[in-house]
Amino acid sequence: MPLTTITTPPTFVSPVSQACTQAQFDTPEFQFWCREVREPFRYHRKLWEYCFLLQVLSSEGMMAPGRKGVGFGVGRETSVAVLAARGVQVTATDLDMDSAQQEWVLTGQHAGSLADLNERWICPPDTFSQLVNFRVQDMNAISPDLTGYDFAWSLCAFEHLGNIEKGLAFVKNSLNCIKPGGLLVHTTELNCFSNDETLDNGPIVIFRRKDFEKLAAELVAEGHEDTLNFTLGDDDLDRYVDVAPYTDRRHLRLSLAGQVTTSFGLVVRKALA
């Protein structure tokens, strides 16, 4: 099966592996998921990641009673509660408190308990407690018993695993968690302009187009499906590069260590056999 790359602007209605762009925010589907996660609408790439995940899972039939999903590095994601409210059984994983980045804990990005994952009361508490369980998990060493799920996901987590190679290895290893025909949805950082110089190791890395192309080629060679779209938008906010201290309203691209990055979502369908 050849590797498929789309060159037209990415759509939010039928997402593939693609970058965050302004046009995707300006759709009824995006605004629907904003309401579902109880976030005010704004042009922010982190909000795009939440909505991208939910749109992919919804469009692929994964948000239904009886489905099972596992999330990595979930922090305090409201997506867990949205899934549970629709009858999905969820295993939410994160680092233990001692291993978690201190900054994550201090900025409220780390879940200390199940209650943190339903703090907005998106899902009835009784339903949430029945469908959601939490466990400690190192993304660099996925437990072999995390198997049999319909889908697996992470939101801007695997760029924090130490280097580019470890991040890409996590994506491939997470395939072991899902059933044949299952779905992976992972978001991370994309270098907007450089396919060579980048942040390739340390607390955060920025993946390049060639990194995702290499990953996709390996996955497709194994029979999996991964359609790529690296087309970046050309609207006003697509051209705007936020600089530190970052804003909360115009934050699709940002300057980080001399590079310009945005969010990129990976969507991989596991081979049937």
Where would I find each of the regions flagged by the language model?
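Conserved class I S-adenosyl-L-methionine
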Residues: 62-75, 82, 91
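Conserved Class I S-adenosyl-L-methionine
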Residues: 195-231
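Short catalytic micro-motifs in class I SAM-dependent methyltransferases
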Residues: 153-160, 189
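Core SAM-dependent methyltransferase catalytic element
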Residues: 222, 236-273
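Class I SAM-dependent methyltransferase Rossmann-like catalytic core
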Residues: 4-64
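Conserved beta-strand signature within the Rossmann-like core of class I S-adenosyl-L-methionine
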Residues: 181-189
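A short, conserved alpha-helix within the catalytic core of class I
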Residues: 160-174
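A short acidic, Gly/Pro-enriched loop at the edge of an enzyme's catalytic core
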Residues: 137-152
